[in-house]
Each structure stands twice: as C-alpha cells, then as structure tokens.
C-alpha cells in the first residue's frame, strides 16, 4: 500500500482487446481492498480510509459498509462467529514516515443494520517506529489448522509474520516476528496441499497509468518460511513467481484476496491502480488457476464466437440439425494428377444451411467439430441482467442468429428462436482451477435451480448438479 514512485514508499461492455474480459458493474471504486467476505446476505470489502464496497451478487458493487478506525489496507477474516478486521494506522511513507501500528478489532456482523453489528477493539499487535527496517502496514490473515497468522510490511524493510490467538485476535504471548520476504508489500497468504503461499505486490503504486504494480508468489512447507519461487530464489532475496500483471487497459494489480467458491471454482480480488475506461482505482476479480502447484490468474470469457468443446468427449456443442455436405469432389483429394493447382475449399455459410432449420426450438447435442454454422456460438454478457462473483450473466447464441441456448424443464438444453432475457436463457460461466470452464444455467424452468451443463455419454448434453470430480461438466471455448 502507498508506495509512490518518488518516495518508493466496465461498464458492462467487455473489451475485445482485453483478455481480462469482465469489468465489474456499478461503482467498484476502491484502493487496497480487503479479502472479500460474506456476511448477512451480502459481500463486503474495505479499503484505505473508512469506507468500503458492498454487493448482493459479487458482480454489481456500490459504496457501503462501515469500518471505524480509518487507516490503510485492512484485511478481514471470519473465525467462528467473529469477523476479525486488521488495519494499520500511520506508515506507508505518508507524510514522509514509516512509524505505524497494526491494530485488530472484531464484530459479529459486517452489516450495519444487523443487531450483531458493533466493533470491539483488540488492540495493537505489531508496530514500527519509523527508524528500524520495517513499515508495519498492509496486514493479511491466514487461518490454518487452528492457528492464526498475520503478515505485514512494505518495501521499506522486511515482510514479517506473527501468530495471533484465534480466540481473541490478540498477539500470542511471547511471539516474535519473523522476517519472511523483502521487496514487496500488500501481502496475502494461502494454504493448499501442504504448501503455504506468500503473495506480494511488487512494483510502484499510486500513479494510475504509470503504476507498475503486479503480484508475485513464493511458497514454503512452513508458515514461517523459507519461501522460495519456482526457480528456487528465496523471497528474502527478492524472488517471486508472477501471478498477475497489467492486462489490456487494467493497470497495476495489487492487494490479492482469495475467494474460494468451492466445487473447483476459485477467484481472487485485487485493485487495479487504474481502469483506463473509468480513470480511477477499481476493484477487480479474476479466476484463480493452479498450474504445477502454483497460482496463476485466469480470465473470464471475453465476448466473441467460439466452438464450445466438451472435455469429456472432445465433441462440440451444436444444433441437432440435418447434416449438410460441403460441395466437394472427393476424387480430387485422392486421384488428382501431379501439378494440379490447389483449390481453396470455402467454409459452409449460415445462408447455405439456416433455411433448412426449423423455425422453432431445436434440440442441442454434441458432434465432431467441422467448422459448421450450427457449431459456432457467440457468447456475450447481457447488460442489466446482473451476474455472480466477478462475472456477468451471458447469453449464448448461434453466431449470426438469435437462436439462443436455453435450459428446459426436463433438464435438457435447446436453442430457442429468439433471446428474451428469460432466466433459463442466462448462463453463468466460471473458469475452474484447471483452466476449463463450468457452464451453469441461471435457472431451470419449474425449479428455478441453477444446473451445470454436462456431457452425458459422448453426444448428449444435460443439466444436472455439478460434480467437480468429473470431467463431464468441464468445457473449453476455442476460437474457430
């Protein structure tokens, strides 16, 4: 947080030129966001200052929430019935100083309207005097196996780790801080498969389009380190593997926060120092993938035309229409004499086949991908339809038409003649941790339940409860 260059201290439109496709809706303006936390039916994140953001669905955000104490770069974690909030007062190179205190408080609700809302001070758990090689700001929690850890620090000195009492939030008696990294700030902590991951923000902040913020990571088998990157370089010597950098017109990602939605869906929050389309620091949410044991940023689906391929069978999602041959002299392939000039074979066009399609709802199945019009789907966000954590609801239509993928009351999918915006025509598309995608209906007619699109056998799609252990519900989107 707050290291200036000098002091070293979506609208709903998806940008085709930007791989990070979905900009959050509403007014997601924040700097140094805390880990997004669910409380009393809403999602909350808090930033530097006393304000924060609130959302009912994780897609449309507005100003809201209440966090007393001010200060910079808070973090939030829920343990039992308490929400612990850490924040720093002072430091960060502001007003030329690095003297700071990391403080803890707790509440039983983050909703100011709840009878359980009300903050209780725990006190100071870490400090820097402005003279030592330390700047005690940017705290981050990790709770694993009954133990509560807190990292903090900036470029001005080391990143340190301490242990807190999860029952009270206070620092454990006699606990000594341990240096675990340098050359980073705005750290975050993860635990996965026996590894502890330390993510830190590198680069310069707080200068909009000129900021070089980006997030790197190291890992250790012990929460106190040593942390090393994928090349074996210790984080205490400036190492760190890239997790996310600037993409498109979103510049300066920093302040990582894990959002584990379960069922193989992980995302992360951060701020961008600037969204060039809005001219301000904004909240960003991206899928989180895991590759060879390391976290890496994924991408929401960008608006465009795709082949949608089943991971189970390798077949493509398509209208169940009669097969129409491409005009072609097969003998030419086998028996053309030497020296015969090559002849371009044009793609089959929509105009050649659509007149033969029924003007009603058509079944959808899976088949060999052959670059046919009935296999090309245009995916686009639906303005005003809302969304889910970090992503909008999409419509999926046969390219060049209004024939729209829709859920049926019998747990099947079909293509209806026109898009109306009905819930059964809206789709949630989440990137899974392996890089494939889960496609879920917003609602199934008759039940209103969300169901996952899966491949039953080789050629039959259906809508059922998602099984994260099965490849049947995993899809890839490929450019034709």
What are these regions (language model features)?
Residues 205-207, 355-358, 404, 418-420, ...:
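Functionally engaged cysteine thiol sites
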Residues 395-399, 403-404, 414-418, 425, ...:
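Cationic, beta-structured binding surfaces that engage anionic biopolymers and membranes
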Residues 413-418, 460-464:
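Acidic, Ser/Thr/Gly/Pro-rich low-complexity segments and short DxT(G/T)-type signature motifs
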Residues 7-17:
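Bacterial N-terminal signal peptides
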Residues 198, 288, 312-337, 343-362, ...:
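A structural signal for the beta-strand cores of small, secreted beta-rich domains
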């Amino acid at each position: 947080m707050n290291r200036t260059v000098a002091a070293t201290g979506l609208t709903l439109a998806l940008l085709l030129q930007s791989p990070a496709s979905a900009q959050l809706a509403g007014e997601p303006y924040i700097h140094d966001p805390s880990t997004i936390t669910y409380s009393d039916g809403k999602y909350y994140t808090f930033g530097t200052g006393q304000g924060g953001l609130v959302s009912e669905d994780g897609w449309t955000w507005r100003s809201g929430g209440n966090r007393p104490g001010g200060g910079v770069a808070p973090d939030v974690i829920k343990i039992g019935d308490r929400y612990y909030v850490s924040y720093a007062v002072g430091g960060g190179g502001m007003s030329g100083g690095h003297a700071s205190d990391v403080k803890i408080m707790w509440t039983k609700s983050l909703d100011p309207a709840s009878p359980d809302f009300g903050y209780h001070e725990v006190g100071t758990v870490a400090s820097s005097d402005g003279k030592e090689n330390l700047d005690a700001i940017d705290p981050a929690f990790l709770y694993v196996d009954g133990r509560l850890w807190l990292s903090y620090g900036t470029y001005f000195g080391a990143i340190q780790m301490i242990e807190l009492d999860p029952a009270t939030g206070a620092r454990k008696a006699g606990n000594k801080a341990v240096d675990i990294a340098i050359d980073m700030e705005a750290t975050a902590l993860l635990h996965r498969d026996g590894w502890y991951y330390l993510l830190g923000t590198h680069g310069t902040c707080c200068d909009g389009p000129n900021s070089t913020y980006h997030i790197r990571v190291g890992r250790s088998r012990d929460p106190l380190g040593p942390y090393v990157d994928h090349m074996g370089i210790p984080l205490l010597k400036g190492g760190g593997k890239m997790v996310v950098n600037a993409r498109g017109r979103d510049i300066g990602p920093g302040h990582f926060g894990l959002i584990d939605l379960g069922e193989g869906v992980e995302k992360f929050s951060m701020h961008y120092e600037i969204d060039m389309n809005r001219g301000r620091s904004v909240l960003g949410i991206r899928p989180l993938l895991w590759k060879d044991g390391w976290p890496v940023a994924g991408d929401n689906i960008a608006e465009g035309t795709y082949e949608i391929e089943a991971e189970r069978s390798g077949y493509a999602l398509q209208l169940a229409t009669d097969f129409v041959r491409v005009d072609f002299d097969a003998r030419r392939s086998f028996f053309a004499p030497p020296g015969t000039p090559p002849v371009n074979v044009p793609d089959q066009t929509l105009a050649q086949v659509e007149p033969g399609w029924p003007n009603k709802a058509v079944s959808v199945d899976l088949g060999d991908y052959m670059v046919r019009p009935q296999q090309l789907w245009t995916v686009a966000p639906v303005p005003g339809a809302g969304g889910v954590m970090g992503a909008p609801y999409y419509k999926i239509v046969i390219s060049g038409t209004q024939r729209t993928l829709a859920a049926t009351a019998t747990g099947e999918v079909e293509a209806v003649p026109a898009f109306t915006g009905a819930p059964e025509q809206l789709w949630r598309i989440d990137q899974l941790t392996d890089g494939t995608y889960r496609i879920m209906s917003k609602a199934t007619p008759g039940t209103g339940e969300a169901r996952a699109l899966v491949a039953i056998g080789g050629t039959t799609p259906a809508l059922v409860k998602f099984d994260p252990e099965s490849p049947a519900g995993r899809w890839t989107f490929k450019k034709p």
